[in-house]
Structures are given as structure tokens and as C-alpha cells.
Amino acid sequence: MAAREGISGRHAVLQALRSGREVHSVLVRKESGEDPALRPIQDEAARRGLTIRYVTEGDLVRTVGGSGQGVGALVAPLAEHSAKDLVLLARAQGEEPFLVAADGIEDPQNLGALARSALLAGAHGLIVPERGTAGIGAGAMKAASGAFSLLPVARVASLPTALANLRREGVWILGADANGGKAPWKLRLTGAVCLVLGSEHDGLSQQTLDALDERVCVPTPGGDLSLNVSAAAAAILFERVRQAEAKRT
């Protein structure tokens, strides 16, 4: 039997269907079958020739690992990429690589939110270490609202090694560091860049810090508390969007 994994939540399932990702089955909680919010999923499943299975909540949880919004699906695993693949993908589109990397992010919801922000900001891919970082399971998929069906992901054995290889490809390595760094708007973010985000508690590992070209820190004039990792990422990512738009006008 072909490998498959479970996802749950309306956005995650709908994006999987629309993206062309291989979907083996769609499951809807019986009590949610008449929910008008599920109509786009039902229509897209029909377009792809998939018969929706209406199941109990218990069966939904057992099959896909969650019951978010009463809908889930069994899908093919994400395509495997290397960090260099992401660079080549960007350059094939005639663009400078714009990548995001996660260093020890443990909360699946934060990883999912990071993927969502990266996709919406126009990143070409996400780099995730094989160890020490949350897996891309049901929790991350739900928080990403379908982003993982559209955003290429590279799983790497060693993030510092991957960053060193990216530098050899001409990619500038920028790390978000709550302990200090330049404000995002004081840096030129529109070239070939990989933005690295650290763990919720410890930030970037020393090995990753040693691999950086520059550090960036989002100022928080309202107090000494630090931003959540996904919030800090969004602030930096969309400063890059602002700079890119300003460059075009």
C-alpha cells in the first residue's frame, strides 16, 4: 500500500485537493455533513472523482489523527526536497532564492504558522531539520491551513551544514535573534536570503549562530517580552515583502 498520512481542518484539506497533491480519501464527521462551510471541499472532491466517507468523530480521529472542523483526509506524504532543490526551484522561476529555516521549533502549531507566513510572503521553501524540530504532522498541518500542500519543504540531517551549502550558492544567511541584531528595516532583505528562526525557549543553537552572516531582531518598544517565534517571523517576512514592493515602484 502506498504511504499516506492524515491531515485535518477545512483549509488543509481544501488546499490538498486544489494543489494536485495525491489524496487517497476524504472523511467528514457525520454530524458535519450538511455544514455549508464544507461545500467547497465536497465540490472539489467530486471534481477529482473522490467519494467522501461520512464517519463518526472517533473514526475520524483514529484515521487522520484529528477532527479539526469535522473534516480530514488521507494524503500522500510531502515530496522530498534538498535545500539545494529549493535554490534551483527559485532560480528556475528567474528569482533569487527566498528561504525560511526552522532551528529547534518544538511546537507543531508554531511550525505550521511559520509555514503559512512563509508561503504568504512568497518564500520558495522551508528547511526543517530531521531531529530537534517538530514533525509535520496533523497539528502542524492544521495550523498551516494548507500551506504545506503548496510550500516545498526540505528535511535536512544538519541545519548548519545546509546553511553552509546555501552560502556557497550565494544565499545570505540571516538569523532572528531576540538577544540582539539589526531591525528588519535596516537590512536589505530582497536578495538571495535564508531566514532562520530558533526554538521557542532557547532561540538559535550556537552552531546555527556561528553559521549566520547577520542577525535580525524585531524591536519591541512596548516592553521586554519577546515575540512568539511565528509572530517575529511574520514581521521580518513581511518587511521583505514591503521592500520588494518598494523596489518595484
PLM regions and their residue ranges:
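Structured adenosyl-cofactor binding patch, chiefly the S-adenosyl-L-methionine
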Residues: 14, 120, 142-147, 206-249
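Active-site/ligand-binding-proximal alpha/beta "capping" segment
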Residues: 174-229
